[in-house]
């Protein structure tokens, strides 16, 4: 890329293959990243993968969407990578794939975040 974007970006659900690849690209562009993940203690794993990174890792789940809104102040962009492959006993498949994107759209408008991917 080589553009040195120097922006603050929130990544929702970036702990999988695509997420790690995206994080690498964003770090190479000097982006400040807020990563929301369901995984506990994921910051330690990130520090091993990306030493001296500029990533703040926040644990969240579908039942606590407000933690996202509380931590996206002054971000330039939200990138939604969250997803699950199959339904679970809690019925989260629909919520993750419809309610979360709707919520992200709502908070993007409310907080004047111009880019939602």
Where do the language-model regions lie?
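N-terminal Rossmann NAD(P)H-binding glycine-rich loop of SDR-like oxidoreductase domains
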Residues: 2-3, 7-29
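Structural motif
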Residues: 8, 76-77, 115
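A structural signal for isolated positions on well-ordered beta-strands in alpha/beta enzyme cores
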Residues: 10, 32-34, 56, 117
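Active-site beta-alpha turn of Rossmann-fold NAD(P)-dependent dehydrogenases/reductases
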Residues: 13, 82, 117
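A short helix->loop->beta-strand "cap" motif at the edges of active sites that frequently abuts
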Residues: 31, 110-115
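N-terminal Rossmann-fold cofactor-binding loop
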Residues: 36-41, 61-62
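Short, conserved SAM-binding/catalytic segment
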Residues: 42-54
């Amino acid at each position: 890329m080589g553009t040195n974007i120097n922006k603050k970006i929130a990544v929702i659900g970036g702990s999988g293959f695509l997420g790690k690849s995206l994080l690498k690209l964003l770090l190479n562009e000097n982006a400040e990243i807020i990563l929301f993940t369901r995984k506990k203690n994921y910051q330690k794993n990130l520090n091993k993968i990306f030493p001296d990174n500029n990533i703040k890792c926040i644990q969240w789940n579908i039942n606590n969407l407000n933690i996202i809104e509380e931590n996206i102040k002054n971000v330039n962009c939200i990138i939604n990578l969250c997803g699950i492959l199959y339904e679970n006993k809690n019925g989260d498949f629909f919520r993750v794939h419809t309610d979360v994107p709707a919520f992200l759209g709502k908070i993007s408008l409310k907080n004047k975040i111009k880019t939602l991917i």
